């Protein structure tokens, strides 16, 4: 295994459930552990944290051995350089935000600190909250403080167990940009547990799919989201993720052109400067197909693409079509009738009409 990777082998047996995984993961970026409730996501995270004693285990983090059952090596949780963020921030209610954060810093001597106090406050936007008690914080503010406390331990690995699950939509949207900043600006690998495709699409670089304690698939976010043989393809939010670059702005029509391998799309004017990267989400339900380009249409974003795969959808009336536009994958959810009428089959050249594009971040 390369020194900058994460190797995790765990076997845990409970009555009625067993976790059995053997993973080699990137030692950087965000790896999402994705699956339905009871699939083993949290159990795997607890194993990594040393909170579960697996019958068989080996854990290596960027070249540092934390656990090896065969060799009798077990680093206890308090000696593992990790931060753990739970669904609800476990803050000391009688201590101010400042003192809660200072508690996290006490775990690390000054010489070993990799993330400064000032940097954490700025990244998470909590400087104005320092003198408040936890009871006077909103749900989103509490989670940001909990994440800050984890970061102030200068972790080599950050574990996040559905940190947005307890938040309503407004608070979730409030905290997501801060999580994106952590992803973009800190060189700390993260394991992020979620059961929501849109959360994974927004934050992850790598995805591990779990089901009944087993790994069913893993790979880059783009590859996993484009596969039709996985449960993600049949979710109502199914679709692909595209990494794009701001190409230019059209000040007359107040539009921005976002370019990627295989084409470009126009979206409402963005504030980002040309050259800045943006992640796009194109849902399968927002892609229609045509055998020829329709010029007199209000649909602006149309790409030439080749059909790679056609499979049955979750209803007998629909099919899922995977296409490729010069290396960029797309998925379309269309009726079986349209599929037959258009003669859609692997290898066929078509025009993919994108009715909507979601900007992630």
From Swiss-Prot:
It comes from the Bacteria. Residues 1-237 form the ABC transporter domain. SUPFAM superfamilies: MOP-like, P-loop containing nucleoside triphosphate hydrolases. It catalyses: molybdate(out) + ATP + H2O = molybdate(in) + ADP + phosphate + H(+). Residues 296-361 form the Mop domain. It is a peripheral membrane protein. GO terms for cellular component: plasma membrane. InterPro entries: AAA+_ATPase, ABC_transporter-like_ATP-bd, ABC_transporter-like_CS, Mo/tungstate-bd_C_term_dom, ModC_ABC_ATP-bd, Molybdenum_import_ModC, Mop_domain, P-loop_NTPase. Gene3D superfamilies: 2.40.50.100, P-loop containing nucleotide triphosphate hydrolases. GO terms for molecular function: ABC-type molybdate transporter activity; ATP binding; ATP hydrolysis activity. Coiled coil: none annotated. Its main location: membrane. Keywords: ATP-binding, Cell inner membrane, Cell membrane, Membrane, Molybdenum, Nucleotide-binding, Translocase, Transport. It holds the Pfam family TOBE. It is found in: Cell inner membrane. ATP binds at residues 35-42. The keyword Endoplasmic reticulum does not apply. PROSITE patterns: ABC_TRANSPORTER_1 (PS00211), ABC_TRANSPORTER_2 (PS50893), MODC (PS51241), MOP (PS51866). Its EC number is 7.3.2.5. The complex is composed of two ATP-binding proteins (ModC), two transmembrane proteins (ModB) and a solute-binding protein (ModA). Belongs to the ABC transporter superfamily. Molybdate importer (TC 3.A.1.8) family. Part of the ABC transporter complex ModABC involved in molybdenum import. Responsible for energy coupling to the transport system. This is Molybdenum import ATP-binding protein ModC 1. It comes from Azotobacter vinelandii.
């Amino acid at each position: 295994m390369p020194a900058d990777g994460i190797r995790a082998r765990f076997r845990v047996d409970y009555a009625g459930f067993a976790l059995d995984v053997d993973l080699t993961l990137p030692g950087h970026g965000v790896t999402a552990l994705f699956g339905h409730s009871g699939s083993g996501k949290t159990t795997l995270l607890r194993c990594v944290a040393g909170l579960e004693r697996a019958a068989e285990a080996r854990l290596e983090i960027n070249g540092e051995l934390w656990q090896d059952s065969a060799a009798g090596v077990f680093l206890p949780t308090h000696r593992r350089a990790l931060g753990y963020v739970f669904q609800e921030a476990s803050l000391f209610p009688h201590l101010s935000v400042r003192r809660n954060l200072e508690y996290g810093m006490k775990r690390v001597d000054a010489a070993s600190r990799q993330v400064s106090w000032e940097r954490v406050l700025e990244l998470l936007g909590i400087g104005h909250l320092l003198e408040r008690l936890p009871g006077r914080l909103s749900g989103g503010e509490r989670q940001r403080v909990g994440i800050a406390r984890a970061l102030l331990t200068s972790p080599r690995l950050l574990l996040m167990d559905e940190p947005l699950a307890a938040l309503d939509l407004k608070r979730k949207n409030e905290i997501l940009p801060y999580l994106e900043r952590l992803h973009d600006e800190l060189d700390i690998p993260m394991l992020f547990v979620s059961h929501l495709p849109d959360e994974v699409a927004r934050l992850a670089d790598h995805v591990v799919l779990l089901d009944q304690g087993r790994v069913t698939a893993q790979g880059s976010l783009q590859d996993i989201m484009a596969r039709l043989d996985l449960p993600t393809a049949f979710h109502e939010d199914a679709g692909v993720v595209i990494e794009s670059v701001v190409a230019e702005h059209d000040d007359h029509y107040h539009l921005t052109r976002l370019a990627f391998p295989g084409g470009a799309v126009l979206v409402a004017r963005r504030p980002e400067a040309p050259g800045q990267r943006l992640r796009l989400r194109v849902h399968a339900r927002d892609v229609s197909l045509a055998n020829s380009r329709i010029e007199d249409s209000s649909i602006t974003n149309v790409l030439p693409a080749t059909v790679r795969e056609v499979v049955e959808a979750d209803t007998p009336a629909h099919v899922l079509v995977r296409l490729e536009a010069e290396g960029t994958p797309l998925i379309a959810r269309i009726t079986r009738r349209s599929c037959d009428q258009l003669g859609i089959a692997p290898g066929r050249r078509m025009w993919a009409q994108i009715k909507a594009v979601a900007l992630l971040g």
